[in-house]
Regions:
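Extracytoplasmic/periplasmic solute-binding protein
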Residues: 141-147, 152, 182-244, 292
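C-terminal capping/gating helix-and-loop segments adjacent to ligand/active sites or protein-protein/ligand interfaces
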Residues: 337, 380, 386, 400-456
Length: 464
């Protein structure tokens, strides 16, 4: 389960000594005479990492404490609450003790922070990057390096779904038959209408087919970002545009498909459509406790869903992922694969802190402790050549992505990375989507926010 305390911690303490993030120690070190990782000698400088991913908070805290214990280098980590990273980054960068390591999500963000991003061309994290396309450039300058390679789609409980397939009257007899939107919707409709029957037959605790589609700040990005990616991707593809850089104007050609998927999510769920923005829903827990069969999210959910401390009933063997079938090229479609997690180094930091930060990141991707934490505790797929053998991904969702790619399916690019003024555009889309779903607005309002809002924000972002 994601760390719900993170947002409280951010409100109460944004100081550089705060420990609530993607990595960090549980307290500052009083010693500066430890030994650096590898062949480094005296411990100098300090590290302040501003983490993007709340669900990895605990693992990063433990990892950074280990590093401090080994080297004497003080590591402070702060994790932004869901949907609040840009706001938090702006606030922290304005402080005297600003982050030395921060995340940029795409080329537009890298452009925004170009005065702060150090050239990483001659660093270990770039040298070890297996696919150099997973680095962002500003001209010839390498401004950030991907720290994980992620996929998202529709998480599903394969144990329950396979059990359903064996029941009389099931829409399909095998999960493999679910390879397009129409079939997925027919299955979801049937499951949602037969919850009690399924529970009696399988001994399950189902309440719905799809986990709640929350539209609060902690969840809405799944739809204004990740589901919205689908119509963007297919339109960019049709237009011959760069799939991750996008184009200044869109027509909303595939928004009817977006509507069909969204309506399925909300109609085949037990959540009241009028309360989706309440913040009271927990889709992860619904899937984790076996109450839902389907849950749109990414491979970063594997670690919290399988962490025994969270008390969920699902196991790793129960979990898999299928594409967000969109009714366009379903039979050839894979998962959505990419990243919005790029490490950048603050070139305005003191040189000793820059050096300490680069050493810390190198240790994270080369040491046993670092690789174990990233692969196993965080459940991430790292894009570095050091992650072999025991440190290859054990994430069932990443494995599903690899299997689809091996079968010749086409991965969907993360076209949402092209979103101009991303927070503003998404907020307007979410507002319209919330009103539509609650019966207080029209779908035309969603289209307007999506299409006209894109043009408006693109013009503002590019000063046209």
């Amino acid at each position: 389960m994601k760390k719900k305390l993170v947002s409280v911690l951010l409100v109460s303490a944004m100081a550089a000594t705060m420990l609530a993030g993607c990595g960090g120690n549980g307290g500052s070190s009083d010693s500066n005479d430890g030994t650096q990782a590898g062949d480094k000698t005296a411990a100098t400088g300090s590290v302040y990492l501003l983490n993007f991913k709340p669900e990895t908070d605990e693992a990063w805290q433990n990892l950074a404490q280990t590093y401090t214990d080994q080297t004497g280098v003080d590591v402070t980590v702060l994790t932004a609450a869901d949907g609040q990273y840009n706001t938090t980054l702006q606030a922290e960068m304005a402080k005297a003790e600003a982050p030395t390591i921060f995340t940029v999500g795409n080329s537009a963000a890298a452009k925004t922070w170009e005065d702060y991003t150090m050239d990483l061309s001659d660093t270990a994290i770039y040298d070890h990057l297996t696919d150099k396309s997973l680095a962002l450039k500003n001209g010839d300058k390498i401004v950030s390096v991907a720290n994980c390679y992620e996929c998202y789609g529709i998480i599903y409980n394969k144990t329950i779904l396979e059990g359903y397939c064996g029941m009389d009257g099931a829409v399909v007899k095998s999960v493999d038959e679910i390879n397009n939107f129409d079939t997925l919707k027919a299955v979801a409709d049937d499951i949602n209408s037969r919850v009690d029957e399924i529970n009696d037959a399988l001994g399950t605790n189902l309440t719905e087919a799809f986990a709640s589609a929350g539209l609060d700040d902690g969840s809405s990005w799944r739809f204004s970002g990740h589901l919205a990616n689908m119509p963007l991707y297919y339109e960019f593809k049709d237009d011959g545009a760069d799939l991750t850089a996008g184009e200044e104007k869109i027509t909303g050609k595939y928004l009817d498909n977006f509507k069909a998927v969204w309506d399925m999510y909300t109609s085949d769920s037990a959540a009241d459509p009028k309360t989706l923005n309440s913040g009271a829903l927990n889709a992860e827990a619904e899937l984790g406790m076996g109450e839902a069969v389907f849950y749109q999210n990414g491979d970063w959910e594997f670690a919290p869903l399988t962490n025994p401390d969270n008390g969920y009933t699902v196991t790793a063997e129960d979990l898999s992922m299928m594409p967000i079938y969109f009714g366009v090229d379903d039979e050839n479609q894979g998962l959505c694969v990419g990243t919005e997690n790029y490490w950048a180094i603050n070139q305005k930091a003191d040189q000793e802190d820059i050096d300490a930060s680069l050493d810390f990141l190198e240790w994270c991707i080369t040491s046993d402790e670092g690789r174990d934490a990233i692969t196993n505790a965080m459940g991430l797929t790292a894009p570095f050549d050091t992650f072999t053998g025991d440190y290859e991904t054990k994430n069932a969702f990443a494995q599903a992505s690899n299997a689809l790619m091996s079968a010749g399916k086409t991965s969907v690019a993360w076209s949402f990375n092209a979103t101009p003024n991303v927070d503003t555009w998404r907020a307007d889309v979410v507002s319209a989507l919330t009103a539509y779903t609650a019966g207080e607005g029209s779908w035309d309002d969603v289209v307007t926010a999506f299409v006209d809002g894109w043009a408006d924000q693109w013009a503002l972002a590019n000063e046209q």
